[in-house]
Design a protein with these regions (language model features):
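Conserved AdoMet/S-adenosylmethionine-binding subsite of the radical SAM
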Residues: 68-72, 76, 210-297
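Proteins enriched for Cys/Gly/acidic motifs involved in redox and nucleic-acid/cofactor modification
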Residues: 1-209, 248-251, 262, 283-295
Length: 297
C-alpha cells in the first residue's frame, strides 16, 4: 500500500504565482489565526482566492470540539483535493493536535500541523513549493476580508482547567499569553487596514496575565492599555468568567469605546452538574455577575 501523502512529501513545481485558499471552521480564535496566516502567505508572494476556486495550496483550519466538527473538517479536506488533485492540502489546528494519525491516513492530505505548531505551517508550505517568484511585490498591502467588519486578535491561547467534558486542553495546550506591546501593535495594524472594531479573543481571555516588572498585568490592564494607546473605535472581548467581573472591569466595559457585550458560558444551572463538570464557578456566582452587569453597565 502506498504511503499517505503527508508522510511522503514531494515538492510542487510551478511556473506561476501560487494561489492559496483557506477554510476556517470553529471558534473566533481560529479566525484570528486565519488572519495571521493569510497575511504571512500574501507577504510571501502567494495570491489568495476563494476556497471554492482552483488553487495550488488549500488550508483547512480545523475544529474538533465535536464529532460533527471532525467530519466537517474531513469533508473540506476532501473537497479541496477534488478541486485540484495536484494541490498541497494542509490540515491545521485542533483536529491534528488531537488526532494527527487520522489525518496522516487521509490520502488527500499533504501537511498536518497541530494548534501549538500552527505558526510553522507557512514555512512548511513554502518549503514544498518550487516556483519562479520574481513577478510579485512581497510588500503588497494586505486587504481585510470584505465579508467581515471585525478583526479578531488573539491575546491568549490554551487552558489548564481540564473540565471533565472538554477537549480544549489537549487541542490547544497549556496557557500562553501575548505580550501587551504586541497586542497594541496588532490593534494598530488592524486600524491601519481599515478595521473599526477589534475583538480580543482567546481560549479564555479572562485568564490573561503578563509579568511587568514587579507586577502582573491582567485583562483589565490590557484593555486600558489598548484604549489609551490606540484610536480603535470599538473594542470587544470574549470568554470572561463570573469571578472576573469586578469593579475595575465594569468601569472599563462602560468606556464609550468598549462594546457593551460580554460572553459568559453557562453549561448548566445545576450546582451538582457544574461540580461534576469541574467548572470553576457555581450558579450563585453566575447570577451575581449577571445582576451586577445589568445594574451597572
Amino acid at each position: 500500500m502506498d504511503s499517505p501523502r503527508s508522510l511522503t512529501p514531494q515538492p510542487l513545481h510551478l511556473r506561476r504565482r501560487p494561489r492559496f485558499a483557506i477554510c476556517t471552521l470553529g471558534c473566533k480564535l481560529n479566525q484570528s489565526d486565519e488572519a495571521d496566516l493569510r497575511r504571512s502567505l500574501r507577504q510571501a508572494g502567494l495570491q489568495e482566492v476563494d476556497f471554492g476556486s482552483e488553487a495550488e495550496v488549500y488550508i483547512v483550519n480545523t475544529c474538533t470540539v465535536t464529532q460533527l466538527a471532525d467530519r466537517r473538517s474531513r469533508q473540506m479536506l476532501r473537497r479541496a483535493h477534488r478541486q485540484n488533485p495536484e494541490a498541497l492540502v494542509a490540515a491545521i489546528g485542533c483536529y491534528p493536535a488531537v488526532n494527527p494519525d487520522e489525518l496522516h491516513a487521509m490520502p488527500e492530505v499533504d501537511i498536518v500541523v497541530g494548534s501549538i505548531e500552527k505558526a510553522t505551517v507557512v514555512d512548511e508550505i513554502l518549503g514544498r513549493l518550487d516556483w519562479e517568484n520574481q513577478a510579485f511585490d512581497s510588500d503588497e498591502p494586505v486587504e481585510h476580508v470584505e465579508t467581515r467588519t471585525r478583526r479578531m486578535i488573539k491575546i491568549q491561547e490554551g487552558c489548564r482547567a481540564h473540565c471533565t467534558y472538554c477537549i480544549i486542553p489537549r487541542a490547544r495546550g497549556a496557557p500562553r499569553n501575548v505580550a501587551p506591546a504586541e497586542v497594541v501593535r496588532r490593534v494598530q495594524e488592524a486600524i491601519d487596514e481599515g478595521y473599526r472594531e477589534v475583538v480580543l479573543t482567546g481560549t479564555h481571555v479572562g485568564t490573561y496575565k503578563w509579568p511587568e516588572g514587579d507586577r502582573t498585568l491582567r485583562l483589565a490592564d490590557l484593555l486600558e492599555l489598548v484604549l489609551e494607546a490606540t484610536t480603535i473605535e470599538r473594542l470587544r472581548v470574549t470568554s470572561v468568567g463570573p469571578h472576573e467581573i469586578d469593579e475595575r472591569f465594569i468601569a472599563l466595559v462602560n468606556h464609550p469605546r468598549m462594546a457593551p457585550h460580554l460572553h459568559m458560558a453557562l453549561q448548566s444551572g445545576s450546582e451538582t452538574v457544574l461540580r461534576r463538570m469541574k467548572r470553576w464557578y457555581n450558579p450563585r456566582q453566575f447570577r451575581r455577575a449577571v445582576r451586577r452587569l445589568r445594574e451597572e453597565v
